[in-house]
Amino acid sequence: VGTHSVHLLADFDINAGAPGSGTTGLPQYAKFGRTIPTQMWDGFLSSNYHSLQVAVNRSFSKGLMLKGAYTYSKAIDYTDADGWASVGFNWGPSFERNRAAAGFDRTQVLQMGWVYELPMGKGKLIAKSGIAEKVLGNWQVNGIFAAYTGTPFTISGPTASLNAPGNSQTANQVKASVDKLGKYGPGQLYYDPTAFAAVTAAATFGNSGRNILRA
């Protein structure tokens, strides 16, 4: 299953500055002295979704019903609608840095549901009659199971060294790969934090991309 969406609405700051330009370098500063964001709401974005979907459907037979679905997919967009959609990189030459795995993307999703009729009661294997049949007969158990991969997130920077109002900054990835430590709980590390460092060079966005790690 695949979809391609076009003309998606979002905010675009037309008063965003170039790296290192600061407030006085904003496009609308020279003409109007305007130093605050100027949001343009327009249908200028697109997104893609591709997936492999498999379903299992076992009708009720011999006391068991089973339904399940598995999806392997990828969603790509420029921003996520989290109440008010806006892109992080508004300066024209940097715009394609917004394109990445969607913030809601889950690579794998597995869902299962089942109903099992216990083999007790009239016409069943045990407890076919009498008190046992009345107490234990005609019972069912059911369950739902779901497992899925985490959603992506960005390692952001403080933007001070970038000095480009209206734009985001990402951290520098200083190691070839980011080790997954896999620990959970307060104070525990899931990823190696030493794989990233703050951007110190002036007028630089950072070499890591949007949504490169997963929760």
Q: Model-predicted segments: where are they?
A:
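Short, solvent-exposed micro-motifs at the edges of structured domains
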Residues: 1-215
